[in-house]
A protein has these predicted regions:
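Soluble cytosolic regulatory domains appended to membrane proteins
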Residues: 1-136
């Protein structure tokens, strides 16, 4: 029954919506990000090319901290980003959890049927929903 519920809950119900995504432009440097956004509250930060509809990857907060500690303030986000997988907003949480495990990733880019960014979803988001459903 729990798995059935997770098949009915869609990414769009759980994701962080576009209007509140904290993301970084790919040409920003470590110095730019540290100056503008410290302390950084998120462990994984989406990186985009021109706008949020062109998310090209994500950076780990610890990579930013490490580059800062090594005085590598001129390193661009495009040089340290990891690839990000894109999913459709109507995918079920059950399928998304499987995909997180299969890809060994912890953040996905969420789009609508037109490929427009609608949000991001993390493994933590999906696990929280799984735990809530298990308690019901």
């Amino acid at each position: 029954e729990n798995l059935l519920n997770l098949r009915e809950i869609k990414a769009e119900e759980v994701m962080t919506p576009r209007n509140v995504i904290f993301a970084i432009q790919m040409d920003e440097t470590v110095g730019d990000v540290v100056d503008k956004h410290s302390p950084i509250a998120f462990s994984r930060i989406p990186v985009y090319k021109n706008n949020l509809d062109s998310i090209i990857g994500f950076v780990h907060r610890y990579d930013l901290v490490n580059k800062q500690a090594e005085d590598q303030f001129d390193v661009k986000m495009s040089e340290i980003l990891d690839p990000i997988h894109t999913i459709h907003e109507t995918e079920s949480i059950a399928d998304i959890l499987d995909e997180f495990v299969r890809r060994r990733q912890q953040i996905f880019h969420v789009v609508d049927k037109f490929g427009t960014t609608t949000g991001i979803i993390t493994l933590e988001d999906a696990i929280e929903i799984q735990q809530v459903e298990a308690k019901q």
